[in-house]
């Protein structure tokens, strides 16, 4: 069995502040003890420089720990007249290592199709960023027993454009749309079932990638349900929304992941 290091990625969405970043690093510096889990902070782009400075300032205190910086979106274009967009190279220059791709809110609110998601996946990797690719089904799709069909379609578009080996440098996040921001989480058994499907789907085209890729669960993860979720054999951590805005609770999730 592959040894996959758990990851806890905090997606602040359009929330947070420089003060929140300071609070998080104050706790990280005293409470994070080792590198058994990887912690990723994905603040709004305006705070990337603040987070990078805090990473530098706390480098000695965090020695032996894995705290990285990510972002919530990337343009599929390298440069040009795209007002408000940020390219992969710009994000790489800012110190980002990871980028969330295809979050359900981007797909739903901003019309990001699976083709656009696949292009953004490619743009991220082109500039040395690791995509955190989000996939997931809606409530009606689950009720219609179409969960696997929807997720397979979302994965296949990315595979068709980028090739299976592109997943050698990628993370997948399963985020059931009916659980995102609702306070209603998938049960550990439901999460495991879908994660196992994703892993099997990728294993069919590359056993190595299927075995080694990290698959996060995202959807109302809290300190009270994280241990059971993270204990599932195919759940490799979480993509965290609301709880990532509370320094104490987010640190609790990191600690749980370290012992998963």
UniProtKB/Swiss-Prot annotation:
The active site is at 103 (electrophile), 175 (proton acceptor). GO terms for cellular component: cytosol. It comes from the Bacteria. Keywords: Cytoplasm, Gluconeogenesis, Glycolysis, Isomerase. Disulfide bonds: none annotated. GO terms for molecular function: triose-phosphate isomerase activity. It is found in: Cytoplasm. It is an enzyme of class 5 (isomerase). Pathway: Carbohydrate biosynthesis; gluconeogenesis; Carbohydrate degradation; glycolysis; D-glyceraldehyde 3-phosphate from glycerone phosphate: step 1/1. Its main location: cytoplasm. Pfam families: TIM. One of its GO terms (biological process) is glycolytic process. It catalyses: D-glyceraldehyde 3-phosphate = dihydroxyacetone phosphate. Substrate binds at residues 11-13, 181, 220, 241-242. Its EC number is 5.3.1.1. Belongs to the triosephosphate isomerase family. HAMAP family: TIM_B (MF_00147_B). Involved in the gluconeogenesis. Catalyzes stereospecifically the conversion of dihydroxyacetone phosphate (DHAP) to D-glyceraldehyde-3-phosphate (G3P). Homodimer. This is Triosephosphate isomerase. It comes from Shewanella piezotolerans (strain WP3 / JCM 13877).
